[in-house]
């Protein structure tokens, strides 16, 4: 059995092509736990999680990445936030009924794929592409073609392992500033495309690579763990409250007695009473714990 929730990087010795392989189970489960999404939405979030992990691994700097789908369909928003440490969180917003067999275009409607990269040092970058492909992988390949102009292929699979949702994916990319023959890249892509969900989700990474590329020389590097981690905090909520007009905050306090701020990503609640608000306005940080 593979060690789920790990990202593996690998290189082809005889081609200027790099690869990545990721499988997620526990991280995906934690993203889904706090919500009751229809199955097609769960699948989209699983694919987005895999894609974000793979994209994050292509970054050469410390920082955050957000991959989101947005449109006028019943799935108005689906987003995964991640960072170079492979710490992930995600959420979706559903408006209206979703049929069990809904595909990506039915879910999102007329929409966009938005990728936002925020380095710890340097300028923020955002790329936007229309949802012209039939799958998330196809849309992401279009993004790479338009933005980085590096030949890139993604292969994403979803399923269940031991009754729990799981997902996996592989990425192939021509290495920057190196010449790779188009036929070599296409050959490797054809091999990778044969991967089945069951193989990717149940076999160790070395076995997957052996099955796909046993005639090639491949170097597999040490894996990086993938985990769910939410960045919400009481301090961040306090900062958000501080930006609201005093009249609006006071009105909520008068009506409700306290302000309940809920994190859509992890389900945490942060409660603020009148004394907390007074401390916030005096630039102090209220120390009450959050409510789970």
Curated annotation (Swiss-Prot):
Location of the protein in the cell: Cytoplasm
GO BP term, example: protein refolding
Major subcellular location class: cytoplasm
CDD domains per UniProt: Hsp33
Cellular-component GO terms for this entry: cytoplasm
Disulfide bonds, paired cysteine numbers: 230-232, 263-266
Keywords (A to Z) from UniProt: Chaperone, Cytoplasm, Disulfide bond, Redox-active center, Stress response, Zinc
GO molecular function: protein folding chaperone; unfolded protein binding
Pfam families reported in the protein's UniProt record: HSP33 (PF01430)
Lineage: superkingdom: Bacteria
Free-text description of this protein's post-translational modifications in UniProt: Under oxidizing conditions two disulfide bonds are formed involving the reactive cysteines. Under reducing conditions zinc is bound to the reactive cysteines and the protein is inactive.
InterPro entries recorded: Heat_shock_Hsp33 (IPR000397), Heat_shock_Hsp33_C (IPR016154), Heat_shock_Hsp33_N (IPR016153), Hsp33_helix_hairpin_bin_dom_sf (IPR023212)
HAMAP family noted in UniProt: HslO
Family the entry assigns: Belongs to the HSP33 family.
Record function comment: Redox regulated molecular chaperone. Protects both thermally unfolding and oxidatively damaged proteins from irreversible aggregation. Plays an important role in the bacterial defense system toward oxidative stress.
Name the record gives this protein: 33 kDa chaperonin
Organism of this sequence: Salmonella paratyphi A (strain AKU_12601)
């Amino acid at each position: 059995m593979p060690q789920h929730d790990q990202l593996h990087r690998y290189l082809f010795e005889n081609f200027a092509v790099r690869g990545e392989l990721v499988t997620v189970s526990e991280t995906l489960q934690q993203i889904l736990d706090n919500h009751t999404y229809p199955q097609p939405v769960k699948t989209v979030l699983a694919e987005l999680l895999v894609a974000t992990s793979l994209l994050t691994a292509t970054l050469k700097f410390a920082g955050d990445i957000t991959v989101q789908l947005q449109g006028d369909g019943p799935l108005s928003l689906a987003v995964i936030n991640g960072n170079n440490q492979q710490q992930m969180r995600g959420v979706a917003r559903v408006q209206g009924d979703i049929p069990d067999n809904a595909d990506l275009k039915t879910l999102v409607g007329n929409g966009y794929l938005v990728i936002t990269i925020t380095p710890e040092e340097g300028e923020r970058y955002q790329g936007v592409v229309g949802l012209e492909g039939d799958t998330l992988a196809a849309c992401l390949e279009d993004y790479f073609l338009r933005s980085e102009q590096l030949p890139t292929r993604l292969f994403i699979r979803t399923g269940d392992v031991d009754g729990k949702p799981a997902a996996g994916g592989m990425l192939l990319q021509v290495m920057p500033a190196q010449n790779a023959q188009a036929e070599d890249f296409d050959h490797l892509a054809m091999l990778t495309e044969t991967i089945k969900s069951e193989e990717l989700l149940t076999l160790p990474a070395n076995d997957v690579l052996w099955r796909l590329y046993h005639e090639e020389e491949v170097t597999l590097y040490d894996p990086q763990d993938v985990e769910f981690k939410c960045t919400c905090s009481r301090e961040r909520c306090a900062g958000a409250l501080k930006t609201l007009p005093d009249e609006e905050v006071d009105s909520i306090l008068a009506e409700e007695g306290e302000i309940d701020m809920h994190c859509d990503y992890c389900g945490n609640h942060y409660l603020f009473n009148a004394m907390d608000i007074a401390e916030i306005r005096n630039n102090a940080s209220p120390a009450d714990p959050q409510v789970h």
